[in-house]
């Protein structure tokens, strides 16, 4: 982490509301945060606390109702859809709970879908090697375990060398041992690529592997915990 550098994200008073009048729901209620290059951040909080809305806003999948949201010099709060699409395509990798792989394509081909439309992308083989799937390049999703499919999804997300990697419950559909393998892949990518990595989870044990743990409650940041050192995923117990 480079605390003295300009942040990757500068966030001030970030607010997101859905609906209006009696049906208005405030998903984010004035979030202030700086997110730094190379950090690994774990977001915790109950369902409905604002974690996913926050991730969608910094990922350019949604826009805030009010407040400041800057990625480097780009004002995401004011960007039009074309600029947000360009931002997502170039700068952000997404990993979700469900893998969204194309069944008729091999692991290599699923990753290549991204490399073919990205600038400065790494070869699909290199991305799959980073998640230890070099021996599964030509396997189809149905021939892979759930954990292997999630690692293909991670390889697909990182092949464009994103500055930001956003993970929403990446181990939610996996057993403990498989989940640890997936977390090892995410940690390795964070360390080797230097991507700012944000992980949403309901599993508080993952907090130990983070640089910072940010807890959300009722659309606000409830607390921020700075870890003095990061635990290896293999040491986590849950």
Predicted regions and their residues:
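ABC-family P-loop ATPase nucleotide-binding domain
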Residues: 1-17, 223-238
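H-loop (His-switch) and adjacent beta-strand-loop-beta switch element
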Residues: 213-226
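ABC family nucleotide-binding domain
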Residues: 7-216
């Amino acid at each position: 982490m480079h605390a003295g550098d300009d942040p990757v994200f500068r966030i001030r008073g970030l607010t997101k509301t859905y609906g209006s009048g009696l049906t208005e729901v405030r998903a984010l209620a004035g979030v202030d945060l700086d997110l730094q290059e190379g950090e690994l951040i774990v977001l915790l909080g109950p369902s409905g606390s604002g974690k996913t809305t926050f991730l969608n806003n910094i990922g350019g999948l949604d826009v805030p109702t009010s407040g400041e949201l800057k990625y480097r010099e780009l004002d995401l709060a004011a960007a039009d859809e074309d600029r947000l699409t360009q931002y997502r395509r170039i700068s952000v990798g997404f990993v979700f709970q469900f893998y969204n792989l194309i069944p008729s394509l091999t692991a290599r081909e699923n990753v290549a879908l991204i490399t073919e439309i990205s600038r400065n992308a790494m070869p699909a083989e290199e991305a799959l090697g980073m998640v230890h799937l070099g021996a599964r390049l030509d396997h189809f999703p149905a021939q892979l375990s759930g954990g292997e499919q999630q690692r293909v999804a991670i390889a697909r997300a990182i092949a464009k060398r994103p500055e930001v990697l956003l993970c929403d419950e990446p181990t939610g559909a996996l057993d403990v041992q498989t989940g640890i393998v997936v977390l090892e892949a995410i940690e390795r990518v964070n360390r080797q690529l230097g991507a700012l990595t944000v992980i949403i989870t309901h599993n508080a044990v993952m907090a130990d592997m983070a640089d910072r743990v940010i807890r959300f409650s009722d659309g606000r940041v409830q607390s921020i915990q700075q870890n003095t050192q990061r635990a290896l995923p293999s040491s986590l117990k849950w």
